[in-house]
Amino acid sequence: MNVLVYGAGAIGCHIGYCMYATGNVVYLIGRGEHYNQMKRDGMHIRICDNEILKREQVVKEDSMFYIMSDINNIKDVKFDYVFITVKLDDYNEHALQNLYPYMGKNTAVIPPCTKLPFWWFYNLEGESNERFKDVDFDQQLSKYFVRENIICMTMWLSSVIENPGNVCVKHVQRGYPLKEVYPKMKNSADKLRDIFKLTCKSPDVDNIRSEIFIKSINSFAFNTVALDREFNNLQLSQDEYSKDCIRKIMLEGDQILSVLNIPIIQNIEDRISQTLSSTKHTMSMLNDYRKGKQIELDCLWEGFSSVCKILRIDMEFSKYMYEKVMDKVCTRQSSADLNE
């Protein structure tokens, strides 16, 4: 099969590796020095269980693995799967305009999972939810998708680019839980799950909205508190105040599932324990903050804020923590600009 991975970050590289290792043709789209290094010397990937190295490989370009910087250089290829693995700030209309020609009428598309998606209310079951079935709160993105072709996949790995060309998967938690959003893609979703299981984890899931919600609220809660406290996972696990803040954010967010009668498939304590089991991990936004890079917290909060307005729900403590952290980030950026 032909697989396009649009975004050669740490997760995108691991997905590319999983697809290539199971005999599929992979087109990996990257940029910058990371792309240059991979193009020259191949993609070096290490897969660990915290401190234990499980697997290590260098994947170089060949007739089954293409490392590219410009998607427009791909000619006459029909893709079975398209993974969109760019950062949320880059998941925009410009990116989708580039991708659109490669998302055919039968191409399964796996968009980012961290932010509550534009299709959140589509095909939502339950009589009480009928009034929400046509709600679209992100029309700039949704117009590029065939909704029936979407496969939702969440990503539960601690993964990082250690330096250009070198990716380390520090810990695999649940791997890649996935499910079709519409019945049309069931066979494609089942096939994709079987492929992932050959090299990673990909559990069966009953309710994909519950999965993606938990991933999104996890990301928002842990990244917000990590940025506020400037703690890695080990430090968060040892600090009761931090864990209490995480609990409060998750509890507020769970109102969304309750109102829509979506099952809460994992309780809050299990979510906290699962995430903090990656003791060597530092939350991605804290890593970016320390490096002076732009963080994505505003994208996450935008998704929750949009849904809360539609459902008339308050996330007062979450909003307070979000604004507190963004003030901190903006103050640091202003200081950096003055010192340039």
State where each predicted segment sits.
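Conserved beta-strand termini and adjacent loop/short-helix elements that scaffold enzyme active sites
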Residues: 29, 48, 68-71, 153-155, ...
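Rossmann-like NAD(P)(H) cofactor-binding subdomain of soluble oxidoreductases
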Residues: 56-163
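NAD(P)-dependent Rossmann-like dehydrogenase/reductase catalytic/cofactor-binding core
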Residues: 244-340
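NAD(P)+-binding Rossmann beta1-loop-alpha1 motif at the extreme N-terminus of oxidoreductases
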Residues: 1-53
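Nucleotide donor/acceptor-binding cores
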Residues: 1, 80, 174
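A structural signal for isolated positions on well-ordered beta-strands in alpha/beta enzyme cores
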Residues: 4, 27, 108-110, 151, ...
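Internal alpha-helical scaffold of NAD(P)-dependent oxidoreductase catalytic cores
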Residues: 102, 143-156, 163-215, 220-264
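Helix-loop-beta segment of a Rossmann-like dinucleotide-binding subdomain
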Residues: 103, 117-127, 168-177, 230-236, ...
